[in-house]
From Swiss-Prot:
Belongs to the phospholipase D family. Cardiolipin synthase subfamily. This is Cardiolipin synthase. It comes from Geobacillus sp. (strain WCH70). It is a multi-pass membrane protein. Residues 237-264, 415-442 form the PLD phosphodiesterase domain. Pfam families: PLDc_2, PLDc_N. InterPro entries: Cardiolipin_synth_Firmi (IPR030874), Cardiolipin_synthase (IPR022924), CLS_N (IPR027379), PLD-like_dom (IPR025202), PLipase_D/transphosphatidylase (IPR001736). GO terms for molecular function: cardiolipin synthase activity. It comes from the Bacteria. The keyword Cell membrane applies. The active site is at 242, 244, 249, 420, 422, 427. Coiled coil: none annotated. It catalyses: 2 a 1,2-diacyl-sn-glycero-3-phospho-(1'-sn-glycerol) = a cardiolipin + glycerol. The keyword RNA-binding does not apply.
Amino acid sequence: MRNTLRVIIFVLAVAAFLFLTNDYWEGKLLGGLSILISCSVVFIAFVISLENRKPAHTITWLVVLGSFPLIGFFFYLMFGRNYRKQRLFQKKAMLDEQTFLKFQGQREWAIEQMPIGEHQRPLLQLAHRIGKSPVSLATETRVLTNGEETFSTIFEELEKATHHIHLEYYIVRHDEVGQKLKTILIEKAKKGVHVRFLYDAVGSWKLSKTYIQELRDAGVEMIPFSPVRLPFLSNTINFRNHRKIIVIDGTIGFVGGLNIGDEYLGKDKYFGFWRDTHLWIRGEAVRTLQLIFLQDWYYMTGKTLLTPEYLSPELVHYDGQGGVQLIAGGPDQKWEVIKHLYFAMITSAQRSIWIASPYFVPDEDILTALKIAALSGLDVRILAPKRPDKKIVFYASRSYFPELLEAGVKIYEYSKGFLHSKIMIVDGELASIGTANMDMRSFHLNFEVNAFLYHTDSTKKLVADFLEDLKEASPIDYETFQQRPLSIRVVESVSRLLSPLL
């Protein structure tokens, strides 16, 4: 399908012609609309079937179109046209791969030097092969727990910037936290520091024009990622930049779950306390984070900054605390990078798998791997929020609980506030922390970035934090959970049916 949209428009035009030339004026409006909707829905269903999507995705779209033709038609135009994903990002994918190979090299020697078990080594090989990122043995990391520690550390490091500041965020708000960030960036820009800021056009759609203009007037290059002007006709509305990246002078980096907003400090009345995790990075691995930003910057602006000024080979090497790997995932990748690495982490486990995720909507591969791990006697724990953020995702998530509980997975509901951490810890030795949720949107559609940690001090801190979080959580009992009302089960089932679209 070279251009499905054009064909859909053609079908609509034919239907309109039949409508206008109809000699039977009685019931003309209803008949015309029926022809319009029927032709469009049938054609879209035909296109979806030819795209050879995963069966669950195909069936879900067919059910939606069959049950709600008009709504399904417009919903598909906005969110369903993934057939163009390869074409949209083919050039970006090719350039990204060439850039990583040029600036990162192969670095197999680092994998061989990693002091890990042989059963864990294939995970590093996989991350290197599909993530195009070497493991660094010369990088310091520090876990930042919750908003107060994260923002105070970020603002402190921004104040020290002397050459450049690069930021990439999904959500930016013009509230107290956003104003504090703006003040620092304007001050730095006026002092000659190069400040570049990528913000997602959909995630930050509420960001005021005044906020943006004030930054631009001060010399900050403020660029929206994939702006959407006509939602129903946009090819990119479904592919959002969910990354949260800061790079300062090419030596300090940040990545994790927190966007820019007051709610991440626990100031939202509904959510209250906000539980989240971020990562401070210094050393060699920051180079990978810089590359990810620079490639996204080039994709949106056409301006290349792949120069020694921003990618100096003479990085200061810090004493590593184990291995650190920064991995980007997204619709521009040939492989479902983040999902494959999550799967590999789960299947490499020998003792335990601990997961914290605000949106737990796994696909069949991840779901099966978790059940098999639990049935094999491993300590599998999932920490999820008790309070819903996005209700349809919340109920879809809970629909997976019975089969996981029955397999022996321990599921806990965090009740102190809202849990937004995106963490996986395996055997207390390997960990992932970043922007990717344990859901299909992060696996298939969003641009994400995660840090994978191997035998680091930060992994120990994540373990300690997870155990502390369990003190604020309640375990779900299988028998009790099975007694929930039928109405709730129906909502969960319908939400799960839509989960491939979430």
